[in-house]
Amino acid sequence: MTTDPSDKLFEFAVCYARTECSGSLISEHKLRSACGRPFQTFDGSLLHPTVVSQAAVLLEGIVLAHAFDDGNKRTGWMTLIYFLACRHQTLRDVSDAEGEEVVVSLVTHNLLLADFAGWIAQHLVPLTE
Protein backbone atom coordinates (compact mmCIF):
# COMPACT_ATOMS: atom_id res chain seq x y z
CA MET A 1 0.00 0.00 0.00
CA THR A 2 1.41 3.36 -1.00
CA THR A 3 1.51 6.53 1.06
CA ASP A 4 2.26 8.75 -1.94
CA PRO A 5 -0.64 11.23 -2.13
CA SER A 6 -0.55 11.28 -5.94
CA ASP A 7 -0.97 7.49 -5.98
CA LYS A 8 -4.02 7.79 -3.73
CA LEU A 9 -5.54 10.36 -6.10
CA PHE A 10 -4.77 8.11 -9.07
CA GLU A 11 -6.41 5.10 -7.39
CA PHE A 12 -9.48 7.15 -6.46
CA ALA A 13 -9.86 8.56 -9.98
CA VAL A 14 -9.59 5.13 -11.62
CA CYS A 15 -12.07 3.59 -9.18
CA TYR A 16 -14.54 6.46 -9.56
CA ALA A 17 -14.37 6.48 -13.36
CA ARG A 18 -14.91 2.73 -13.57
CA THR A 19 -17.83 2.60 -11.15
CA GLU A 20 -19.64 5.89 -11.78
CA CYS A 21 -18.82 6.84 -15.37
CA SER A 22 -18.16 3.51 -17.08
CA GLY A 23 -14.91 5.13 -18.16
CA SER A 24 -11.94 3.03 -19.17
CA LEU A 25 -8.45 4.30 -18.49
CA ILE A 26 -6.78 4.94 -21.83
CA SER A 27 -3.64 6.72 -20.59
CA GLU A 28 -2.22 5.77 -17.22
CA HIS A 29 0.73 8.11 -17.78
CA LYS A 30 -1.51 11.15 -18.37
CA LEU A 31 -3.59 10.43 -15.28
CA ARG A 32 -0.53 9.85 -13.08
CA SER A 33 0.93 13.12 -14.35
CA ALA A 34 -2.29 15.00 -13.60
CA CYS A 35 -2.52 13.50 -10.10
CA GLY A 36 1.08 14.48 -9.42
CA ARG A 37 0.65 18.14 -10.39
CA PRO A 38 -0.39 19.34 -6.93
CA PHE A 39 2.83 17.95 -5.47
CA GLN A 40 5.35 19.21 -8.04
CA THR A 41 8.41 20.94 -6.62
CA PHE A 42 11.19 23.13 -7.88
CA ASP A 43 14.39 23.54 -5.90
CA GLY A 44 12.75 21.81 -2.94
CA SER A 45 9.67 24.05 -2.80
CA LEU A 46 6.14 23.17 -3.84
CA LEU A 47 5.09 24.92 -7.04
CA HIS A 48 1.52 24.96 -5.70
CA PRO A 49 1.91 25.56 -1.96
CA THR A 50 -1.73 26.03 -0.94
CA VAL A 51 -4.63 23.59 -0.83
CA VAL A 52 -6.52 25.95 -3.13
CA SER A 53 -3.83 26.05 -5.81
CA GLN A 54 -3.24 22.31 -5.50
CA ALA A 55 -6.94 21.60 -5.92
CA ALA A 56 -7.14 23.87 -8.97
CA VAL A 57 -4.22 22.25 -10.81
CA LEU A 58 -5.48 18.78 -9.91
CA LEU A 59 -8.87 19.29 -11.52
CA GLU A 60 -7.41 21.11 -14.51
CA GLY A 61 -4.85 18.36 -15.01
CA ILE A 62 -7.38 15.54 -14.92
CA VAL A 63 -9.97 17.12 -17.19
CA LEU A 64 -7.44 18.27 -19.78
CA ALA A 65 -5.49 15.00 -19.77
CA HIS A 66 -8.44 13.04 -21.19
CA ALA A 67 -7.03 9.91 -19.58
CA PHE A 68 -10.42 8.17 -19.71
CA ASP A 69 -12.62 7.38 -22.69
CA ASP A 70 -15.60 8.83 -20.79
CA GLY A 71 -16.25 10.84 -17.64
CA ASN A 72 -13.12 12.98 -17.49
CA LYS A 73 -14.90 16.08 -16.15
CA ARG A 74 -16.96 14.12 -13.60
CA THR A 75 -13.91 12.18 -12.49
CA GLY A 76 -11.87 15.36 -12.20
CA TRP A 77 -14.60 17.03 -10.13
CA MET A 78 -15.00 14.08 -7.76
CA THR A 79 -11.23 13.70 -7.40
CA LEU A 80 -11.10 17.39 -6.43
CA ILE A 81 -13.77 16.74 -3.77
CA TYR A 82 -11.83 13.69 -2.53
CA PHE A 83 -8.58 15.71 -2.44
CA LEU A 84 -10.24 18.41 -0.34
CA ALA A 85 -11.86 15.88 2.00
CA CYS A 86 -8.47 14.28 2.63
CA ARG A 87 -7.39 17.72 3.83
CA HIS A 88 -10.51 18.15 5.97
CA GLN A 89 -11.97 20.73 3.58
CA THR A 90 -15.02 20.86 1.33
CA LEU A 91 -16.84 23.24 -0.99
CA ARG A 92 -19.88 25.07 0.37
CA ASP A 93 -22.95 26.26 -1.50
CA VAL A 94 -22.08 24.73 -4.87
CA SER A 95 -24.97 23.29 -6.84
CA ASP A 96 -24.43 20.52 -9.36
CA ALA A 97 -25.17 23.03 -12.14
CA GLU A 98 -22.60 25.52 -10.83
CA GLY A 99 -19.98 22.80 -10.45
CA GLU A 100 -20.61 21.66 -14.01
CA GLU A 101 -20.48 25.23 -15.30
CA VAL A 102 -17.15 26.02 -13.65
CA VAL A 103 -15.56 22.78 -14.87
CA VAL A 104 -16.77 23.33 -18.44
CA SER A 105 -15.54 26.94 -18.31
CA LEU A 106 -12.11 25.72 -17.22
CA VAL A 107 -11.97 23.05 -19.93
CA THR A 108 -13.00 25.48 -22.67
CA HIS A 109 -10.47 28.05 -21.43
CA ASN A 110 -13.20 30.57 -20.60
CA LEU A 111 -11.97 30.50 -17.00
CA LEU A 112 -8.32 31.00 -16.14
CA LEU A 113 -6.66 28.67 -13.66
CA ALA A 114 -6.04 31.57 -11.25
CA ASP A 115 -9.71 32.53 -11.41
CA PHE A 116 -10.71 28.92 -10.80
CA ALA A 117 -8.45 28.87 -7.74
CA GLY A 118 -10.18 32.04 -6.56
CA TRP A 119 -13.56 30.37 -7.04
CA ILE A 120 -12.40 27.41 -4.95
CA ALA A 121 -11.18 29.78 -2.22
CA GLN A 122 -14.57 31.50 -2.11
CA HIS A 123 -16.36 28.19 -1.50
CA LEU A 124 -13.79 26.39 0.67
CA VAL A 125 -14.82 25.58 4.23
CA PRO A 126 -13.62 23.15 6.90
CA LEU A 127 -15.19 19.71 6.65
CA THR A 128 -17.42 19.07 9.63
CA GLU A 129 -18.02 15.61 10.96
Identify what each model region corresponds to.
Residues 1-129:
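FIC/Doc superfamily catalytic core
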